[in-house]
């Protein structure tokens, strides 16, 4: 049977059944799998050098966890660390060469007074002893995880040449309670699932969160008025704007790269079609006009094209149309079900929910080499809603395990997975946010 889009499942009552659950708390996190071919790196403990109270955050532990879950690095286990230098001048490189480490990170945490801490760290190439990075950052105790994520980003970029995406955020929806008394929440958290923040609470379903390019707002679908409506909400202030509540379906908002427009799916003229809305004038441009269901639009990085899901050919596939209108062309040809596309920053990779029979997994279409290569990234049977990290090194997606919804973040080579689970609610509808500005 052809799988319905998420918003259509809501409308016809096809939501997965939920057991009785209480209101959500934070996510529990664990790493699944490992990459033996990853680059070995030793991230040494960074002790606190002062008599005042130490920060609660284990900075080096967060850095190591970030690098591990990227799939590009394999950090040396603490039990195998035989020496613990905190300055580059203290490193004995033959020790780390014998441990077959390519890189080493050392550092220390200092009291910077007035409730702040200073983290100093260095990155070295073990093979030649060259210092590749030496930086210091100062922050309050509450921001030490942010500091650690930024450190991991800097290390990742220095070694790989690609900007890190650890200092980013994710959005997702939780669902708790039982039928007749369901509660939904739109949440925002750090990229590793820590520091969850509730953005919206509702007794009606919430769907399809999408980040503005500056990371300050979220567009989403709410059913609080009975039918579907699209809102845009400011994360910091909580203020929100109703932008689409036309008769029929209002679904799948997607911010343009310029932040001034959204693409969306509307059934105001009959079948669900793809539109573009100017967020100032609210003027609509209709891009598609087919006999099938056109939904789940997502923009190319330059804003010139929109990818979307359509069953105009009989089964759901990904199509592409110019953002100013024109003839749509089919993009996916492998498999009889491809939906819910997410496009990489360079437009060379697309991840989709790919179905075969009753099994739905996350697959990536990679055109980086000039030819089309498909890889399956997930291992479940009901995996959906993939979302690229801003550097395309990881993919966030939703899955079903034991009758409940969980999230996974998988490395682009599929070798490392991070599972994000709420102890008291379903987790679904993930969206990876853009790069955050560093102040």
UniProtKB/Swiss-Prot annotation:
State the source organism's domain of life.
Bacteria
Pfam family name, one: TolB_N
Name the gene that codes for it: tolB
- Single Gene Ontology BP annotation: protein import
The record's PANTHER family line, in alphabetical order, gives:
PROTEIN TOLB (PTHR36842:SF1), PROTEIN TOLB HOMOLOG (PTHR36842)
Known NCBIfam families for this protein? propeller_TolB
The UniProt keywords, alphabetically, are: Cell cycle, Cell division, Periplasm, Signal
Q: SUPFAM superfamilies, alphabetically? A: TolB, N-terminal domain (SSF52964), Tricorn protease N-terminal domain (SSF69304)
Q: Which organism is it from?
A: Xylella fastidiosa (strain M12)
HAMAP family in the cross-refs: TolB (MF_00671)
Q: Which family does it belong to?
A: Belongs to the TolB family.
Q: Does the keyword Cell division apply?
A: yes
Q: Give the protein's recorded name.
A: Tol-Pal system protein TolB
Q: Where in the cell is it found?
A: Periplasm
Q: What this chain does, per the record?
A: Part of the Tol-Pal system, which plays a role in outer membrane invagination during cell division and is important for maintaining outer membrane integrity.
Kindly state the subunit structure of this protein: The Tol-Pal system is composed of five core proteins: the inner membrane proteins TolA, TolQ and TolR, the periplasmic protein TolB and the outer membrane protein Pal. They form a network linking the inner and outer membranes and the peptidoglycan layer.
For this UniProt entry, what's an example GO CC term?
A: periplasmic space
Q: Which residues form the signal peptide?
A: 1-22
Is Signal set as a keyword in this record?
yes
């Amino acid at each position: 049977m052809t799988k319905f889009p998420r918003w259509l499942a809501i409308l016809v009552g096809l939501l997965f059944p939920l057991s009785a659950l209480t209101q959500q708390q934070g996510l529990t996190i664990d790493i699944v799998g490992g990459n033996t071919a990853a680059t070995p790196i030793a991230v040494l403990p960074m002790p606190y050098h002062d008599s005042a109270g130490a920060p609660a955050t284990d900075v080096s532990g967060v850095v190591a966890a970030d690098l591990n879950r990227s799939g590009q690095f394999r950090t040396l286990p603490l039990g195998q660390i035989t020496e613990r230098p905190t300055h580059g001048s203290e490193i004995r490189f033959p020790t780390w060469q014998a441990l077959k480490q390519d890189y080493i990170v050392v550092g220390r945490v200092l009291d910077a007074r007035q409730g702040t801490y200073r983290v100093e760290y260095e990155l070295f190439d073990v093979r030649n002893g060259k210092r590749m990075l030496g930086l210091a950052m100062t922050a309050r105790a509450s921001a030490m995880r942010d500091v650690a994520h930024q450190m991991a980003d800097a290390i990742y970029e220095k070694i790989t040449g690609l900007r890190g995406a650890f200092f980013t955020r994710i959005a997702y929806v939780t669902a708790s309670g039982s039928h007749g008394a369901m509660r939904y929440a739109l949440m925002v958290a750090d990229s590793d699932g820590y520091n969850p923040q509730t953005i919206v609470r509702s007794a009606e379903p919430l769907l399809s969160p999408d980040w503005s390019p500056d990371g300050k707002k979220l567009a989403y679908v709410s059913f609080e008025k009975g039918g579907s409506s699209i809102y845009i909400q400011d994360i910091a202030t909580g203020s929100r704007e109703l932008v689409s509540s036309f008769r029929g379906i209002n679904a799948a908002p997607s911010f343009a790269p310029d932040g001034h427009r959204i693409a969306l799916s509307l059934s105001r003229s009959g079948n669900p079609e793809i539109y573009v809305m100017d967020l100032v004038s609210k003027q609509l441009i209709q891009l598609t006009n087919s006999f099938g269901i056109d939904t789940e639009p997502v923009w190319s990085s330059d804003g010139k094209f929109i990818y979307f899901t359509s069953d105009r050919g009989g089964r759901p596939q990904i199509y592409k149309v110019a953002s100013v209108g024109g003839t749509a062309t089919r993009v996916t040809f492998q498999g009889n079900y491809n939906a819910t596309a997410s496009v990489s920053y360079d437009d060379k990779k697309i991840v989709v929910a790919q179905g075969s029979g009753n099994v739905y997994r996350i697959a990536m279409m990679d055109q980086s080499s000039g030819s089309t290569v498909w890889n399956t990234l997930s291992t479940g049977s009901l995996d959906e809603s993939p979302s690229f990290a801003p550097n395309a090194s990881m993919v966030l997606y939703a899955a079903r395990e034991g009758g409940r919804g969980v999230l996974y973040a998988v490395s682009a080579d599929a070798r490392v997975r991070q599972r994000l689970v709420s102890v008291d609610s379903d987790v679904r509808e993930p969206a990876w946010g853009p790069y955050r500005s560093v102040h």
